[in-house]
Amino acid sequence: MPHGLSVCSRSSQLNYSQRCFYKSNSELRRGTSPRLSIPISLAPSQRSRSPPSILGHPELRPRSHSPPPPNPQNSRDFSPVQSLACSRSPAFNCDVHETVQVSKTCGSKPKIPRVDQLSTHCRRHHSLPLHLTHFSKQFNLLHARCSDVLFSSSDRRSLHSVSRTRDPVLQSHSASRVSFHRSLSLPRDLHLQDLRSDSPLHPGESPLRLVQSAPPSPILAEDFLHPLAFPRFVCDQAGILGPSPLHIDPARPTTKALSLCTPPRPAKSTSPCNNSQLPKPTAASDKPAILPTAAASTQPGLLPNSRLRRTATSHLSAPTSPPPASANKRLQRSLHLHSRSPHSSHFRPSRICANSKQQTRARLGHSKRVGQSADLVCQCPPPPPSMLPLLLLPRGKVKAPLRPTLASLSFGSHPIPYHVTSSPPLIQFQHPFPPPSATFSVSPLGVLTTAFALNPTQSAERSCDPESPTPTLGHKTTSLSRLPLPPPHSPHSAQDRASALATDVSNSETKNCPSPTVPPPFLPNHLHPLLPGTDPPTTPRQLSPSPSSLSLRTFLDSAVISCDSSPVLPPSPSPSSHSSSSFQSCTSPPRFPCYPPPPSALDLLFSSTPGTDPFPPPDTPPPHKRTIALERLRLRQCATPFHSCDDVC
């Protein structure tokens, strides 16, 4: 029964294949089945020509294949050695075929064939993918890794030379592939699109930017012989005064340079009393010395334009004043200034000095060589008219009888304490203990020399007897308050008269008052006593009449009236106890040079009461306000005694 065997064999094979294909997916999903996970057929493959169906159902198999021949002996022969390659169509075995073909291409020759040798099949570079194509002949499809396909190579020597034409790359389905590869050596302009141009942060940029390649240019060698390549020295550069003029050619006529070595002019005298002491200007000092140069100039007013570029000076000779050999050549530039000569009709350039080293110091800021001409006169601004200068007499014009009086002065080391309160009266200060006599001079218009000499015993007697007449004091008051003032148009004669008047007053007071202890007047901060060894200061200036002179006269009168109207004065020390201190104060210089009062006290001292006469007669009683102020001053003096020098210090 051969048909039965064949049917059995067929049914067994079909059942095996059916059983294998039905359970292969579930076993593969679990992964832990004791059965075979890969559905491999155990039947001999020599007689099974039909490929297994993709679906495991037997009814879906293709029925065009003929059944196998009946062979009962081979149908049950299950050989363990079977081929792994299944008998399927090339479309289903593409992965296996790819593996075999790749292994074969490893030993192929590395040389790339020419373009004309490549395959020109029309279906090679098709736009559609392979899984969408439907061809009747599937064996004609070539995989990407086949041996006849161009593969990548690192050997660039095998590449052929391509023309430098900029033709676009040919599309697929073209027969010619000559210009397939583009030249990579030539630069090309690229159009880059800036994606940030649409953002609001960059509203001004254009969307397209043209990037150009730099043109190839050889590196140029620097030409050191070019005239612009030479560095400019310091002497050729323009300084503070501008660029220097060109060097003078001795063949051409030049201008006469004014020398700055002339002696300085004498300073202008501020008062006519010092005109005799100053040297008279001579004709040589008025006209500056002129040093002759090479030749006279035909056009002295023309100067070269300093803004034009200087020409080359290699063919010219040396400058007019050659510098010393030790000077640096870069610092041989002369400064040119205009001299302020009153006799010159035009300005002429002149050199400061011939030595370039000294000239360099002047350019660098040397104090003695700043570059100013010698005929410049320094003039100080005049002082304000409100000041009262102190006129100190010259040493040669002081008379001899004034020396003993000044030698007996004692300014002591007692500072004058002042205490200004907030009370409304006119004068508020603390009266010090009366030191020795003092002589000083004040010059508002002319010369007003005042000397005070009061006897302490007479002052004590007048303080005890307030109703006693004071003829001597009245005489002195009259002589002090009615000093004759010279006219302002003759200051020199006024000075002589004032010095003679001061000499007479000092002689009369020396004879009448043997005791040297006299109260001096109050000295303001700008009034200093005339000491025998002091030098006269600068020459005082004549001032116009001002109300300050009237206030000074009022102050002097009030000082004398206060001595007359005060009924009680502080007790004066005995001559024996005060002799040693007065002798030391007369012989030794003062330790504290007479402290001046503050400005607020001066304003109170030199301010006159409105509505009062600035020149009151000696017999006229003082005003009521002034009497109250002096009485308050006396009470404050009695309440606060004067301390010694050690206590004050």
UniProtKB/Swiss-Prot annotation:
Compositionally biased intervals (Low complexity): 524-533, 540-550
Domain of life: Viruses
Biased composition (Polar residues): 268-279, 504-515
Biased composition (Basic residues): 330-349
UniProt-listed InterPro entries: 45/70kDa_tymovirus
Pfam family, one: Tymo_45kd_70kd
Region (Disordered) residue spans: 28-80, 257-286, 311-359, 458-550
Family statement: Belongs to the tymoviridae protein p69 family.
Descriptive protein name: 70 kDa protein
Originating organism: Eggplant mosaic virus
